[in-house]
Regions:
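A domain-start/cap signature at the N-terminus of enzymes
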Residues: 24-57, 170-172, 266-270
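Conserved alpha/beta-hydrolase
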Residues: 81-100
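The feature captures the conserved acid-bearing segment of alpha/beta-hydrolase catalytic domains
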Residues: 162-230
Length: 270
């Protein structure tokens, strides 16, 4: 018969071993490696679909942008994608190149949405997750489709063409001169087109650094949130002091962000 002390040590060792085993399994899971590549309108797209989904329910999902070549999404997204995958939430995205949210890119986004929701049983209300210039791409689609969104999340997302990439650089993507683009900002620049998102009260949550020189807080996340909330909408910005436009791990392992995403992608999570 084991003495109380030996029993305690044995039980403790068992618990520790069990926890370590669970951690090893979690570390071995790389949702990004489970992606399936598909083609939509001659553009490369991907899906990551968890197993053991309810066949009678729409598949909850997160729409990630930007999807660019083999680099994005990449290693920095693995922690987030693993959390989503483990909680039964799919991830998808499509490569539209450096569209800056132009009408052609918006049309391709619509083609992806239609394919996934009509042919693959994906939910009609995904959570959009835009990182950096992915914000322009997703917001340009979102402002035109407020009834097709569960929520919008962002990691230092671009919201304003004037701020990034600037009108001179963006204009060729729109087949316009910079001056022509400036004249048409009211129907092409997401931060000028927010009324539908405010009216629909789409939940919005951004992480943004106060030292971002590439996508500054003021003309992007702050301007968007101020305008949305002034119109009665629902936008929150979590400002990270001292951080800029970088690959700090805290952007990609933020518990508040991932819980926001999961709450609106899969309401049963909350």
């Amino acid at each position: 018969m084991l003495s109380p002390n030996r029993f305690f040590l044995s039980a403790t060792a068992g618990i520790v071993f069990s926890l370590l085993s669970s951690l090893c399994v979690a570390q071995e899971t790389n949702a990004l490696s489970l992606r399936t590549n598909i083609m939509v309108n001659d553009h490369r797209a991907f899906t990551i679909i968890p197993g053991d989904l309810d066949p009678d329910e729409p598949i909850p999902w997160v729409w990630y942008a930007p999807t660019l070549g083999k680099g994005l999404p990449g290693q920095h997204e693995i922690w987030m994608f693993n959390r989503l995958y483990a909680n039964g939430i799919a991830i998808a995205g499509i490569d539209v190149g450096e569209s800056y949210g132009n009408p052609k890119g918006v049309a391709i986004y619509q083609a992806l949405y239609d394919k996934l929701t009509r042919e693959n049983r994906f939910s009609r209300k995904p959570v959009l997750l835009g990182r950096s210039r992915g914000g322009l791409m997703l917001y340009s689609w979102a402002v035109r489709n407020p009834s097709s969104i569960g929520a919008i999340a962002g990691i230092y997302p671009v919201c304003n063409l004037i701020s990034y990439p600037g009108l001179e650089r963006a204009a060729p993507a729109f087949h316009m001169s910079a001056e022509e683009l400036r004249t048409n900002l009211g129907k092409l620049n997401p931060v000028e087109m927010l009324a539908p998102l405010a009216a629909a009260k789409i939940p919005i949550f951004h992480l943004q650094g106060d030292n971002d020189k590439v996508v500054p807080l003021g003309p992007n996340s702050k301007l968007l949130a101020d305008r949305i909330n002034t119109m009665g909408g629902n936008a929150q910005i979590r400002v990270i002091k001292g951080q800029g436009h970088n690959l700090w791990n805290g952007w990609f392992t933020n518990e508040e962000l991932i819980r926001f995403i999961m709450k609106f992608a899969k309401p049963s999570f909350d």
